[in-house]
Regions:
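A short gly/proline-enriched turn/hairpin at secondary-structure junctions
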Residues: 72-83
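Extracytoplasmic/secreted proteins, especially bacterial periplasmic and envelope-associated proteins
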Residues: 39, 43-46, 50, 62, ...
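Short, well-ordered alpha-helical segments enriched in acidic and aromatic residues
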Residues: 57-74
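Short, low-complexity N-terminal intrinsically disordered segments enriched in polar/charged residues
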Residues: 24-57, 65
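Hydrophobic pocket/interface hotspot
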Residues: 51, 63, 71, 89, ...
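Surface-exposed, charged secondary-structure patches
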Residues: 90-135
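Sec-dependent bacterial lipoprotein signal peptides
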Residues: 1-24
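Short beta-strand edge/turn micro-motifs at domain boundaries
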Residues: 25-33, 120-122, 138-163
Length: 163
């Protein structure tokens, strides 16, 4: 083979290898989702999973560490008397979690949207719990779509709504 033909054959082989390698590259997603597996989304999901584990442990102090000092919950109603901030979150968690005798709580991640230092995490909650009550224990199920809102504070993601 002449030198020019050998050059073109080598170049064509290298081009085919490079093109083939590029074609094998793929975007990495969290299993069973269309959520990109990148450093930011990993940190966000790790934060939400810490929340889920601490709920299962009834760990009020651990949950409060995950909440921003600017936390605000409007409870989704037009009334303002059921809205609360960080201090109210302390009271809600303390009073409600001590009534929970058993808890099953799973989170299915649907979407994560990050805009600057804010992340909206769309999930499907699947859970059940047993409440201690004066009239006897009560069982409840939870199956619903939900949204957590987090903000980045000092390189950590903190909940500002949805806990």
């Amino acid at each position: 083979m002449s030198a020019p033909n050998q050059f073109f054959a080598t170049a064509a082989t290298l081009l085919a290898i490079a093109t083939g390698a590029g074609a094998c590259a793929h975007t990495d997603y969290f299993p069973g989702t269309t959520i990109l597996r990148n450093e930011e989304n990993i940190k966000i999901i790790e934060t939400v999973e810490q929340y889920r584990r601490r709920m299962l442990e009834h760990n009020v102090d651990g949950l409060l560490v995950l909440a921003s000092s600017t936390y605000f919950e409007d409870s989704g109603t037009p009334r303002s008397d059921d809205d609360y901030g960080y201090e109210g979150l302390k009271q809600v968690l303390s009073s409600k979690l001590k009534l929970v005798k058993s808890l099953r709580y799973e989170i299915e991640y649907r979407n994560i949207t990050v805009r600057g230092n804010r992340a909206d995490v769309e999930v499907f909650l699947d859970g059940s719990f047993e409440l201690a009550a004066e009239a006897g224990d009560r069982y409840r199920r939870l199956n619903d779509y939900h949204q957590f809102v987090l903000e980045r504070e000092n390189e950590q993601w903190k909940f500002v709504r949805g806990m």
